[in-house]
Structure formats: C-alpha cells, structure tokens
Amino acid sequence: MTSLPLGVKVEDSAFGKPAGGGEGQAPSAAAATAAAMGADEEGAKPKVSPSLLPFSVEALMADHRKPGAKESALAASEGAQAAGGSAQPLGVRPGSLGAPDAPSSPRPLGHFSVGGLLKLPEDALVKAESPEKPERTPWMQSPRFSPPPARRLSPPACTLRKHKTNRKPRTPFTTAQLLALERKFRQKQYLSIAERAEFSSSLSLTETQVKIWFQNRRAKAKRLQEAELEKLKMAAKPMLPPAAFGLSFPLGGPAAVAAAAGASLYGASGPFQRAALPVAPVGLYTAHVGYSMYHLT
C-alpha cells in the first residue's frame, strides 16, 4: 500500500505491473491518476471571486499579492463612488480609503487654525506689543461689539455726618464770653427766665444760645462726676485681699483663751504653787484690726 502526497491511498494490486512493461512505468501512472483526482476536487469547489471592496482584506493585501490588484481596486472604488453620487465627506478624496499606503500631501499648518476658519489676518489674533499697533480686531471696532471705556474711579470722598439742611452754624464764643458763662454756671446751674434774659443781654448773646450752652455744660458736668465716682471705686478696691497678709484678733478672744490655759497649767494644784504668768491683752481696739501692707508702710 503506497501513500501519495495528495492524500490518496493506492493499493499495489490496483496498479500492478503490466505484462510487458518495466518497473519505471508504475510511478508515472500513479502520479497521473492523483493529478486527475486533484483537478476533479478543485473543480467541485465553488470559486469565490475576490472582493474588490476598499475595506476588504483582498484590497488591503493587493500590493503584496498581485502587481495589478492595486489599480483594479482603485478603479472599482472610483466606479462605486461615481455611481453612488458626487457627494463626498469633508476631507476625503476618492481612493484614499482603498489605498491607505498611498502617500498623502501634508496640509498646511494654518489650514485648521482659528485664523483660517474665521478668515482673519494673523496680526488681528495676536495682541499688539507696541502701542502703535491696533489692540482690537476690525470687527470689534464697531460700538456694537466694543465694550464701553473703563471709567477711572475717583477716590471716595470722606462721608460726613449728615445734619439738617436748616441747621444753624455753631456759635463762636469769645474767650470773655466763655469765662463769664463758666463763672455763672459755678454760681448757679439753672437760670430763671429773667436771669437768662439779663445775662444774655450783658454778653451780647441771645437767650437761646445761653440756654443751649447751659444744657451742654450740665451734661458735661454729669459725665465728669460719673468718671470721678468710677475712679474712687477703683481706688477703694485693694490690690490684694487683706486676709492674705493681715492678722485680725477679736477683743479679749486670745487673752481669755490664754488666761484659761495658764490657770489650768499653773494653778494651785500640788505641793508647789507657781504664780500664773500674766498675759498682756492683744485686743487694743473695739473692732477687728487688719495688719496689711498698707499699715506696715
């Protein structure tokens, strides 16, 4: 049994030696039979025509397989585009998808720039460094697009206290008038109508001016009096409590305790009698005495 390269098994009995032939004719007959069987198998398979679509594997590998496949793919893609219509997507040329290996010319750098889209000059998109060049584009010069000119803010004015519009100006008293008013205020803080009329005429002032001056002076005296009282209260409070450094003894308290203790210790008890030690009274005042830092100075 002989194994052929095409996978066809041929028995030796089928291809026996002919009666009048030699041994060299057997291999040639077997090869012819195998070739005929291979041709029949290839004829039985359906033949698939190569696809000429631009995205197919056949079109992509056309350069490596056949030298004329590239031209046929280009022609087929151009015919399909012509039959489909003349509308083409932006930036796509005929045959560019069918032949990706074809070199494409690079587009200029400013093709997709903002200046190319708006069709504006390049100097209009760049801010001028010198004051001679215009700082805004021509279409912004119109009052519709140009912003209003910036206003220079002046420094804020000092806000004064608002007074009434019909407010009378402050009366400028002279030194002699002020001395006379102060002397009269020390004598009497409240003036009667007759006294006020007489006093105002002597100073060449109106009764209203004298009345207002006395009102303001009484308010000032009240403020000064309250401040003096506050100072006295603060001065009356000691810096440290007197119990920290002072000693206070009640009248007769320690003396009575010491006398009782001496009488019990040295009293007449036993063979030897001793006189009790006199204890000087410590309480010299009728009230508590505090010896603090104020009394030691």
Swiss-Prot record:
Residues 166-225 bind DNA. One of its GO terms (biological process) is negative regulation of odontoblast differentiation. It is found in: Nucleus. InterPro entries: HD (IPR001356), HD_metazoa (IPR020479), Homeobox_CS (IPR017970), Homeodomain-like_sf (IPR009057), Msh_Homeobox_Regulators (IPR050674). One of its GO terms (cellular component) is nuclear periphery. The keyword Zinc does not apply. Its main location: nucleus. Keywords: Developmental protein, DNA-binding, Homeobox, Isopeptide bond, Nucleus, Repressor, Transcription, Transcription regulation, Ubl conjugation. Interacts with CREBBP/CBP, TBP and SP1; interaction with these transcription activators may inhibit autoinactivation. Interacts (via C-terminus) with PIAS1 (via N-terminus); the interaction is required for the localization of both proteins to the nuclear periphery and specific binding of MSX1 to the core enhancer region in target gene promoters. Interacts with H1-5. Acts as a transcriptional repressor. Capable of transcription autoinactivation. Binds to the consensus sequence 5'-C/GTAAT-3' in downstream activin regulatory elements (DARE) in the gene promoter, thereby repressing the transcription of CGA/alpha-GSU and GNRHR. Represses transcription of myoblast differentiation factors. Binds to core enhancer regions in target gene promoters of myoblast differentiation factors with binding specificity facilitated by interaction with PIAS1. Belongs to the Msh homeobox family. This is Homeobox protein MSX-1. It comes from Daubentonia madagascariensis (Aye-aye). The gene is MSX1.
